[in-house]
């Protein structure tokens, strides 16, 4: 997790995005830290070559920033975590008064089918299941973009070429990241393409109609064993418990890639 502020700073500097970057929890709240360097490389964002950093992270801890920002808000803030939920879970426990201040949480993580880090668990949830359990039991409205949805966004060499033609630093960054991803997908799984997981969350926020969801009761398994870190999704409602999550089911991939290209071209127009 320590590499994440550096990655965030690198991306912001390359794309000239003038927003503050905050460092958060260096470890999960209970378990030992795990990484997916076989997929994302040693830095967590291998592929692009970044210039030396000329900026640094803010001195305020990310958890404090989350709490302070939410407490000062009118309840109109949506959180979009695309990694382990450690920072949000700690913020919820430190200051429960933030819960009604959160409009919703649109997260990338979990699966109602097969995992990708274990047969049962998706990486982001498996990296800190106890934190995920705090979030999923918080009562805050949740939207889950899990593997069943995100794996439909298969990026191929043709998609990469399309974004390269769109041009600019954003197209270049997309190409560098996804060419590395395709390399590791082939090396690890023998696949010729790879999903673009995180962007589905932003796609949903821009146009929810592009993604079909189903209301489900979702519980995170924190028991030791082969299902540790699994998001148990009551797809058929057999438990009789109220739904706590909108779970992504299908995505209009033509719309999705069109939106990604629109964002790449939109970056060029604003810089």
From Swiss-Prot:
GO terms for cellular component: cytosol. It catalyses: a pyrimidine ribonucleoside + H2O = a pyrimidine nucleobase + D-ribose. InterPro entries: Inosine/uridine_hydrolase_dom (IPR001910), IUNH (IPR023186), Ribo_hydro-like (IPR036452). It comes from the Bacteria. Its EC number is 3.2.2.8. Keywords: Glycosidase, Hydrolase. One of its GO terms (biological process) is purine nucleoside catabolic process. GO terms for molecular function: purine nucleosidase activity; ribosylpyrimidine nucleosidase activity. Substrate binds at residues 185, 197. It is an enzyme of class 3 (hydrolase). Pfam families: IU_nuc_hydro. Belongs to the IUNH family. RihB subfamily. This is Putative pyrimidine-specific ribonucleoside hydrolase RihB. It comes from Shigella dysenteriae serotype 1 (strain Sd197).
């Amino acid at each position: 997790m320590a590499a994440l502020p550096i990655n965030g700073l690198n991306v912001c500097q390359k794309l000239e995005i003038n927003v503050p970057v905050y460092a958060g929890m260096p470890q999960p709240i209970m378990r030992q830290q795990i990484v997916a360097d076989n997929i994302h490389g040693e830095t967590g964002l291998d592929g692009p070559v970044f210039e030396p950093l000329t900026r640094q992270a803010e001195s305020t801890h990310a958890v404090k920033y989350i709490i302070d920002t939410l407490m000062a808000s009118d309840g109109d803030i949506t959180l979009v975590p695309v990694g382990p939920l450690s920072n949000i879970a700690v913020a919820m426990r430190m200051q429960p008064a933030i819960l009604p201040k959160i409009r919703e949480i649109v997260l990338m993580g979990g699966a109602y089918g097969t995992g990708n880090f274990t047969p049962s668990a998706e990486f982001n949830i498996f990296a800190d299941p106890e934190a995920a359990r705090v979030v999923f039991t918080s009562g805050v409205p949740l939207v889950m973009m899990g593997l069943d949805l995100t794996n439909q966004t298969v990026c191929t060499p043709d998609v990469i070429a399309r974004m390269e033609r769109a041009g600019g630093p954003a197209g270049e960054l997309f190409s560098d990241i996804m060419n590395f991803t395709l390399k590791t997908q082939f090396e690890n799984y023998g696949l010729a393409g790879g999903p673009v997981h995180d962007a589905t969350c932003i796609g949903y926020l821009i146009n929810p109609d592009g993604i079909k969801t189903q209301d489900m009761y979702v519980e995170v398994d924190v028991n030791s064993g082969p299902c540790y870190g699994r998001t148990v999704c009551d797809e058929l409602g057999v438990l009789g418990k109220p739904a706590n999550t909108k779970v992504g089911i299908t995505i209009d991939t033509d719309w999705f890639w069109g939106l990604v290209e629109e964002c790449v071209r939109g970056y060029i127009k604003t810089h």
